[in-house]
């Protein structure tokens, strides 16, 4: 199973990678992108089953990225993460069937 991590902070991406128990989750490949535009391209190319992404990023938000990906990867599992508690982002994440918002 492929995991795509999309976050504009490299430290966050590397921290997540080092803390995720890949074997227990069945993850065989980790992909990374530094914003929504690059995340969209990586997702289209590699078709990850799980997408873990930040909500607020430069160039394209995680919400906008996953709205566009819904057409191409309707079965992917989105998980949003954010340091913000904005209710509008949370509502948008729920609409996109995010399994979690952390």
Where are the model-predicted features located?
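Switch/coupling loops of ABC transporter nucleotide-binding domains
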Residues: 1, 28, 76
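Conserved Asp/Asn-Gly motif in the active-site loop of CheY-like receiver
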Residues: 30-37
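A generic structural motif
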Residues: 24-30, 46
